[in-house]
Amino acid sequence: MMKRALPALATAGAVALLLAGCSGSSAPASDGPAEITFWHGYTEADGKVLDQIVADFNASQQKYKITTETKTWAVIDDTLLPALSSKEGPQIVAMPAERMPVYADRGAFADLSDFYASSDSNTADLVPQAVDMVKVGGTPYGVPTGFVPLAMFYNKSLFSAAGITEAPTTWDAWVADAKKLTVDENGDGTPEQYGVAIPDHATVANGLWPSLLLSGGGQIVDGDKAVIDSPENAKTIQYWTDAITKDKISPTGLDGIAADQLFSSGKAAMHVGGPWMASIAKDNNIDYGIAAIPAGPAEQAASAIGVAMGVTESADDAQRAGAEAFFSYFFQKDVATKWSLASGWPPLRTDIPLSDVSSNPVVAALSEIAPTGRALLPGVVNSTDVISDIDELTQKAVAGGNVDELLATAQTKIQQAIE
Amino acid sequence: MTTHAPSAPPRRRGAYRPPAPIGGRGPLRHSPRRRLTVVAFLTPAMVILTVFVAWPMISALRLSFTDASGFGREKFVGFENYVRVFTDEDILRAMGNTALYALLFTPIAIALALGFALLLNNPLLPLRGVFRTALFTPFIVSLAVAAFAWSYLLDPQIGLLNYWLRGLGIQLGNVLQDPTLAMPAVVLVAVWKSFGFYMVIFLAGLQDIPTSLYEAARVDGASAGQRFRSITFPMLGNTMGFVVIVALIAALQAFDQIYVMTGGGPYGSTQTIVMEIYQSGFRKLELGFASALSYVLLLITLVLSLTQFLFFSRREKDAA
Amino acid sequence: MTALAASPAVTASEAPSRRVSPQRRRRRLVSALLLVVVAASTLALMLPILIIVFTAFKPVAEVNAYPPTLVPGAWTLDNFTRIFTELPFARLIANSFVFAGGVTAFALVFDSLAAYALARLDFRGNKILLIAIIASLMIPFQATLIPIYQLVSDLGWVNSYAGLIAPRAADAFGIFFLRQFFLSLPRDLDNAARIDGAGELRIFGSIVLPNAVPALLTLGIFTFVNNWNDLLWPLVFTTDAEMGTVTSGLTLLTGPGGIIPQGVMMAGSLIALLPLAILFLMIQRRFVESVGTSGLK
C-alpha cells in the first residue's frame, strides 16, 4: 500500500509547495514609486538612448520607476508568453508591430482608447499610419515606437561604374537600371554582380512584396476579406517574376537576410532594406545612397517596418498609469526628436520639421520618404499564417509557377487564416 | 501483477521457502521492509518526475480541451482541438512530413552508427581512440550550431559545398529552398549530429559480446557475414531495441535544425509536428491547440514504440 | 566487412612458422584498408566542425567572401574579443557549468536508484511505471514548457539555479537507459549477496554500480552535453541576462534585421564546445578502461 501512497504523497508535497509559493507572492509596495518593468529589443546604440530616455523619465517624477530589460525581438517573442502566463511578465513590452494584433486579440494588452482620447497624451500629432499599426478592430492597444517605410539602398560606386547618375523612380527605370548593373563577366550563367537583390520569401520585415503589390494597385486584405487575387496583383507578380527570371536581375531563392548580405558584400547594386542597412553598408565600406522604392503603375507605396509598445495585462492600475505617463513623456516633441535621431528612424510626430533631424542624414533621408509608408497587415490577428501564405505565393511564382492559380490558392488560404 | 524475473530460483514443489527477501515471486514480495526499500529507491526520481513531468503533462492535457493562450481568458471547447488536428490541411501535411522524416532518419542513423561501431570495434583498426573521439564530436555540437554550420556549407552563394561541387560540374543549387532536397538536408544534419551517440551505445553493446562466441564460430568455419547475422545481431537485440525507440522518438520530435535551416519551408515541405506545436503555441498563442497536437503526437509515438518494444523483446528472448 | 576480433593466440600456436607471414600480411592489409576507409569518412564527417573552427577565426569580410575558403586567409581574434565584450560570456560559461553539472549530478544519482528498482526489484506496477516513464519521453518539451514554467514560478524559483536544475534533476531517458543496462548485468552476484542477507542499498552500491561505470559515464556525458546545449529551457526561464547559459546567450547575438554575425557566433560556439570536448576526452579513457576490465563475460 505504501507504494500506492507514494504518488499521493508526492503530489501532496508538491501542492503544499505550490500553496506556500503562492502565499509568498508579493503584495504591491504601498509606499515608494510603482515599479514597472519594460522589455524592448533595441540592442544596439539606440537601446542605450532608449534606456536613457527611461532614466530621464524616472528622474522627472517620483511616482513611477521603470526598469528596462533588453533582449532581441525574437527572444521577447519566445519568452513573453511564459512570463505572462505565470504573472512574471513585464508591464510594458515593445514588439514588432505585426506581432501586436495576436497578443492584443488574446487579451495581453490593455485597451488604450481613453489614453489616446485624453488631451495631455501627446498622441494627437502622431503619424496616422503608425497608429493604424496598433489598432485591432478599431481599438488601439499600444503606441508606436518606430515606423519607417522600407527604402531602396543603392551602391553609388557600382552606379557610377555603370554610368547611372540617379536612383530610378519608376518600375521600368528600376528594371532597366538593374539590367545594366547585372554583370556576368565570365559568361558562366551566374552573374558576379546583380542589379538588385529581390528575396522571394521571408523578405525584409515581410514587406517587399506587399510594397510591390500596393504600388501596383492591389491589396492583400481588405477589412475581413482576402482580396489578394486581383488582376492588378497578377500583373505585378508577373512583371517582377519575368524581371527576375528572364532578365536575371536578381538571384532566385533569396530570403531577406541573404539579400541584406548580398548588398553589403557589394554583389548587388540595389536592395530594399530597413534603416539598419545604413550602418551595415558603412561597416562594409559601401558608398550607399537612400531613395524611395520606385513608383509602380498605381502609386508609390512602401510597406513600413513598425515597432510598438503596449501595457500588458499583468500591470495593476498604478503601473498602468505609470506606463501611460511614460508614453506621454515619450511623445513630447523634444524627446521624440531625440529618439528619432538616436534610433535612426523618422520622427513619430508629424509636426517635427525636417530641419530638426537634419543632423542625422539617414534619418533626414528616411523622413523625406516617410509619406510612402504603409502599415503591413494592420489589425490582422493571424499575421503569421497570412505572411507564410504570401511567401508561398511569391516563392512559387518566382520558381516558375502559374501566377493565376497561385493567387487563387493564396486567396483561399488567406481567407481561412483571417477567419 | 507479476514481473518475469529471468533468474528467479526455480520453485521446488511443496518445499519450504526460506523467508529471505530474494528478488523473485512469492508473497514475501509485499513485506513492509521490501516495500520500504522499493519506495526509498524510487522516491527521489519519482518526486521530480511527478512534479515536473507528470503534473505539467496533466496540465497540458487539461489545456488541450480549452482555447487557452496561456494567459487571459480561456474557454472549454471539448474535442474541438482534436478534431482540428485531424482535419486541418497544414497539420496533416506536418504529419506526413514527420513520418517521412522518421522513415529517413531512423534507419540511416542506426545503420551509420552500427557500421562505425563495428569498424571501431575491430582491433585491426589503428588509432581507434582518435576516431572514436572524432566521430563523437558532432554529437557535442548543439543542434542549432550544427544547423548554422550546415546552412553556411550549403549556402548557394558562399557555401563551400556548392563551390566544390560546382568545380566538379555538379550544380547543387539552393538546397534548403528546394522542395525535394530540403527534407533530406535536414535529415542529414540530424543524422550527422546523432549517430555518434548511438555508435557509442552500440560499441558498449558489442563489447559485451564474449569473444569466445566468435572464436567458436570461426573454428566452425562461419564467414564474417554469418558471424554478424547469427551472433552480433541477435546479441545486440537489447541494445538495438533501445536505440530504435530512442531514435524514433527523437525523429518524431524533430524541431531544432528545421527551425534554424528552413523554418518549415519551402512551401511547408519540412514542417514537422513539433514545428506546428511551437508555432501554434508561441506564434499564434493557441496553447490549447498546441497541447492537443502534442497529445496526438504522444499517442502516435506510444503506439509505434510499444510495437517496436514488443518486437525487440521477442527477439531478445529468442536470442537468450 | 565485419571482420571481428581474431584471437592471435589461437592461430599463432596452431600455425607452423611458414603460415605466420601471410597471416600477418593479410592482417596488415586489412588494417590499412580499414584505416583508409575510416579516416576518409571521418574527415568528411568532420567538415562542419572544421567550418566552425575556421570561421571563428575569419574576419567578417572573408566570411561572406566569394569564392569561399575553408582555412582563413587572414586569421583574426576579433570574433573572440567581440564575444566577451558583447556578452557576459565568462559568467554564462559558469552558469552553463552549474546548470549542466548540477543536472547531471542529480540525474545520475536519482536515475540509477530508480532504474535499479525497476530492473532488480519486483513490485506491483513495475511494468506500468516503466511504460509511464517512457511515455513521458514522447511529449515534446514545447508542450509542457508553459505549465513547467508556471509551476517553477509559483515556487518562487524564477531566475534561480534551483529552478533551472530541479525540473531536470531526474529524467525518463536516464532511467530507461540504466534500467536496460542493469537488466543486462547477470544476477548471480547480487542474488548471492541477497542470500547472505545484504540490504538492497548495499547490493546497489557495492555490486551493481561498479559494474555499471561505462553506462553511467555514457549517460553522464549524454546528460551533460544535452543540458549544456539546451536552448529553449534556459532561454525562457532566465529573464536576467546574467543568469543565462552559453546557448541562450548566443541568441542575443542577433544583430538588427535578424542578421547573425557568423564569425562571432562560431567563435562563441567554439568556446562552448571546448569544455564538452575536454570532458569527453577525459572520460573517454576511463570509459575504455572500465569496459576493458568488466566487459568480457
What are these regions (language model features)?
Chain B
Residues M1-P32:
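Short, Lys/Arg-rich, polar N-terminal cytosolic tail immediately upstream
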Residues R34-A320:
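A structural signal for multi-pass alpha-helical bundles of membrane permease subunits
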